[in-house]
């Protein structure tokens, strides 16, 4: 927020040439006086073309097409479709809660080949436990999949800054990726474990979060929906998050976790890629950082920021 169209496109370019793949508008970014939508699309296209030429790798941008009315939403979609992007290099981000389910379904039916990115801004009004008549993150995620979303934010499973328990977020992610469910929650073995056996209770609750729980819940006719993870993550938290999720079948979008790198966005993207490489090679990021300066700088910066936050925490 706050960048002009060309400045925003420059940040996209820096992320892409740093090794990143997927850039998104955030939920409040649309058509602004200082960042007109048409110019933003134009400059992002130029930045993407340059990054693809330099890296030899495909890149993706998710454009926020949310609008106060139907005509404007479609106008933005058509602007992107006609901008000359390669197929598969753009997505439509829709604020599904505020724009409404009709907007999500309209995008899916009009643009069957486009990745529909469901941003869940304002979901907390429904999914937080403080609301006695709301619904869970699992229900929201399944609604989004049913409406045709290709991906939806599912939370950070207790690792990032987003509210939500690991069990809640993992269950949502697992369910929108599944095609068929069998076995009701109350028939699972963990339901009969004595409550005073904490070790076993913890084990089976973790197992529960990673398995399908709804019996009459076949999704064989529905395409999978990709979990999108964002909110308070950075390169030092990538492995802890993957360990909790027990898999890498997700998209992660890091804002400050990338742009706040001491050397800027390009170095932040490189640090994230290096953290991923370390995980794939089963090397700790501390060891991998000895030969990868961007990752070393990220570890130093985010570790310092974490310690400062703990010192300033009024609970301490």
List each language-model region with its residue ranges:
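Extended, intrinsically disordered, low-complexity segments
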Residues: 165, 187-206, 265-316
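Active-site-proximal, glycine-rich beta->alpha crossover segments in alpha/beta enzymes
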Residues: 1-20, 27
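Aromatic/hydrophobic pocket-lining residues that form the small-molecule binding cavity
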Residues: 8, 37, 41-44, 73, ...
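Glycine-rich, proline-tolerant flexible connector loops at the mouths of alpha/beta enzymes
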Residues: 20-42, 156-163
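Catalytic alpha/beta core domains of metabolic enzymes, predominantly
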Residues: 75-77, 84-254, 263, 267
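Conserved, mostly hydrophobic/aromatic
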Residues: 15, 241, 272
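Flexible, glycine/charged-enriched surface loops at secondary-structure junctions
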Residues: 22-27, 31, 51-58, 185-193, ...
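N-terminal active-site wall of soluble small-molecule enzyme domains
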Residues: 52-61, 68-81
